[in-house]
């Protein structure tokens, strides 16, 4: 989510670090900062763009002259609002250790309380600051450890994901780095080394890199680097020679950001669940709503307001909450909610969903709900945006920056958050502990199942060839898969400019069936659930009118093959998690149809990423 760049060599560090941060801007961020060593530690950090940091550097950068070692960071907030004090790097109390961190420290709260009990003072609201104080404490208790040993011991206390760079004026000629679940790469130069979260800020300086693996750390000096495991076992690493352009590296080697973001979903799903889903305990921990959970459980009704793809996620949330928590749910387009004079009371909970947290219609719905006395909670991806500031409580999706205008990973992240919410609302009320445990186990298996679906990318592209010249398309689903049909149709419309409609499969005969002929592709979500037999009947109705059927079906279903032109298989799963699987082939199908038609999939015409006007 964030960007890391480090340098050690013989050149001025600050300009190199600043340029590296500019190369990392594509990742999305809310603040930036750097720390360098030139006898003592010097640090600058600023909320907002890298250009804000550059202005600060131009004014006070003389203090950084002569520094040839440094680290810098662009932050995407996960704990604590975007602000100067929450920006990285973070320093220990004495100002001789600085650290930058990507990832989430799951047990930071317990560690923070422990450190505060020993007199440590925290300057920020971040989870990352815990690490620098932990390293400081360990090193003070045993000075023989050195920086490397102190970092190693500190990481043994940490639960969660991290990619870190640490420097200290006590040992000014090295950078110590480590990773677990958050990528780091070392660039090998001549008498200099670069460390980064990806190759984008490195490639203009060297094409020789070493990628760290999970559970590894490295000590980097001007002349050498050593890689070891956290357990202190030395590793021999292969040097990779890059042949990518800068633009391609920014896209992770993918042709478009949208495809990159589709393929990021297994890891994003793990990030959303990390520290929240406790499978063996049969519970979820949702810190953002923990203090309000009893009030949420007492709601007479839940109303969900959203726009576009977030509205489709809200529909799935309706199914989940009603099935498991047995609380009535209504889902409104935010743009309609405010104009229909809705009946809302203090007994209601209104959930607003927005990737950006700035969607104008959703903000208007939020404010109306508050005026009418409802409890309002938010589901949002961008920390510090307007929705989390104006709602009583809420949950972040932790999907990371989404560059492509057509939402993919933000949608699946929202659905997972709603699934976790349904489990939290159900606990102790409507379903047993064992059932919650089974549901959470199903949810925890989803990332691996999505990875399996993504392996069919080439086969899905072949199917897209048959659809690229269509003028219209119909998407059908039932139950949990009806909102997925809506989302699949929206994706095709957004990026390929082919008219498409999503319908509940049974509603086909109430109008859309009149449109079906040999030129009409019909994409049917036909998974093995309690609506399977009915879906097969709907497919027969399409076939009898010469419609071209493409099915999304459960692995091992051979019966479906005789009824369809093409089948895309997904792994078996319970109905409640199926939307997280069935949407993936529809995202890929839309992407490939659009690219085959020569469309700009990352920036489709007439659309904006965040709709901030009504």
Swiss-Prot record:
Keywords: Aminotransferase, Cytoplasm, Glutamine amidotransferase, Repeat, Transferase
Catalytic residues (positions): 2 (nucleophile), 609 (for fru-6p isomerization activity)
Top-level taxon: Bacteria
Domain Glutamine amidotransferase type-2 as annotated: residue spans: 2-223
Pfam families per UniProt: GATase_6, SIS
EC number of this enzyme: 2.6.1.16
UniProt subcellular location: Cytoplasm
Record GO biological process: carbohydrate metabolic process; fructose 6-phosphate metabolic process; protein N-linked glycosylation; UDP-N-acetylglucosamine metabolic process
Root EC class: transferase
MF GO annotations: carbohydrate derivative binding; glutamine-fructose-6-phosphate transaminase (isomerizing) activity
Domain (SIS): residue spans on this chain: 292-431, 463-604
GO terms for cellular component: cytosol
Keyword RNA-binding: no
Predominant subcellular localization, coarse grouping: cytoplasm
Cytoplasm listed as a keyword: yes
Record's catalysed reaction(s): D-fructose 6-phosphate + L-glutamine = D-glucosamine 6-phosphate + L-glutamate
InterPro entries: GATase_2_dom, GFAT, GFAT_N, GlmS/AgaS_SIS, GlmS/FrlB_SIS, Ntn_hydrolases_N, SIS_dom, SIS_dom_sf
Annotated NCBIfam families: glmS, PRK00331.1
Role description: Catalyzes the first step in hexosamine metabolism, converting fructose-6P into glucosamine-6P using glutamine as a nitrogen source.
Subunit field text: Homodimer.
Protein's name according to its UniProt entry: Glutamine--fructose-6-phosphate aminotransferase [isomerizing]
Natural source organism: Chlorobaculum tepidum (strain ATCC 49652 / DSM 12025 / NBRC 103806 / TLS)
Gene it is expressed from: glmS
């Amino acid at each position: 989510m964030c960007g890391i760049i480090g340098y050690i060599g013989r050149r001025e560090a600050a300009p190199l670090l600043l340029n590296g941060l500019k190369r990392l801007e594509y990742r999305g961020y809310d603040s930036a900062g750097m720390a360098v060593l030139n006898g003592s530690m010097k640090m600058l950090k600023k909320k907002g763009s890298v250009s804000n940091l550059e202005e600060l550097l131009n004014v006070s950068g003389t203090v950084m002259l002569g520094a040839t070692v440094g680290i810098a960071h662009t932050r995407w907030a996960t704990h604590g609002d975007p602000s100067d004090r929450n920006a990285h790097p973070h320093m220990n109390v004495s100002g001789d250790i600085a650290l930058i961190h990507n990832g989430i420290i799951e047990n930071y709260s317990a560690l923070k309380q422990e450190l505060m009990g020993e007199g440590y003072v925290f300057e920020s609201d971040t989870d990352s600051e815990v690490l620098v104080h932990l390293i400081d404490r360990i090193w003070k208790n045993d000075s023989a450890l050195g920086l490397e040993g102190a970092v190693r011991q500190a990481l043994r206390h940490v639960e969660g994901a991290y990619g870190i760079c640490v420097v200290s004026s006590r040992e000014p000629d090295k950078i110590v780095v480590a990773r677990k679940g958050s990528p780091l790469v070392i660039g090998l130069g001549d008498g200099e080394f670069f460390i980064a979260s990806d190759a984008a800020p490195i490639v203009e300086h060297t094409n020789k890199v070493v990628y760290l693996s999970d559970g590894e750390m490295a000590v980097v000096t001007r002349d050498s680097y050593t890689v070891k495991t956290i357990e202190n076992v030395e590793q021999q690493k292969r040097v990779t020679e890059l042949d990518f352009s800068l633009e391609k590296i920014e896209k992770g080697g993918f042709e478009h950001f949208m495809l990159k973001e589709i393929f990021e979903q297994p890891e994003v799903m793990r990030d959303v669940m990390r520290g929240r889903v406790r499978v063996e305990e049969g519970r979820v921990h949702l810190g953002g709503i923990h203090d309000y959970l009893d009030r949420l459980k007492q709601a007479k009704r839940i109303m969900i307001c959203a726009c576009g793809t977030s509205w489709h996620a809200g529909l799935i949330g309706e199914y989940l909450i009603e099935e498991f928590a047995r609380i009535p749910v209504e889902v409104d387009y935010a743009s309609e909610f405010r104009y229909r004079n809705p009946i809302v009371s203090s007994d209601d909970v209104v959930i607003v969903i927005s990737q950006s947290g700035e969607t104008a219609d959703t903000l208007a719905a939020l404010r109306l709900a508050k005026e009418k006395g409802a409890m309002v909670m938010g589901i949002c991806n961008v920390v510090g945006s307007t929705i989390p500031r104006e709602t009583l409580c809420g949950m972040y999706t932790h999907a990371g920056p989404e560059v492509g205008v057509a939402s993919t990973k933000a949608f699946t992240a929202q659905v997972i958050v709603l699934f976790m919410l349904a489990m939290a609302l159900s606990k102790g009320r409507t379903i047993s502990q064992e059932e919650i445990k089974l549901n959470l186990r199903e949810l925890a298996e989803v990332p691996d199942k999505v990875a399996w679906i993504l392996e069919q990318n080439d086969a899905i592209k072949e199917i897209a060839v048959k659809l690229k010249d269509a003028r219209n398309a119909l998407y059908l689903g039932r139950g949990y898969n009806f909102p997925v049909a809506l989302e699949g149709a929206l994706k095709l419309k957004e990026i390929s400019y082919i008219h498409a409609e999503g319908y509940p499969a049974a509603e086909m005969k109430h109008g859309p069936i009149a449109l079906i002929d040999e030129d009409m592709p019909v994409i049917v979500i036909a998974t093995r659930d309690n609506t399977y037999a009915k879906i097969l009947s709907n497919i027969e109705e399409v076939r009898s009118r010469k419609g071209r059927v493409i099915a999304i079906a459960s692995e091992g279903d051979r019966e479906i093959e005789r009824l369809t032109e093409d089948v895309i298989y997904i792994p078996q799963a319970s109905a409640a998690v199926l939307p997280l699987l069935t949407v993936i082939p529809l995202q890929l199908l839309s992407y490939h149809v659009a690219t085959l038609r020569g469309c700009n999939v990352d920036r489709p015409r007439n659309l904006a990423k965040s709709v901030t006007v009504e």
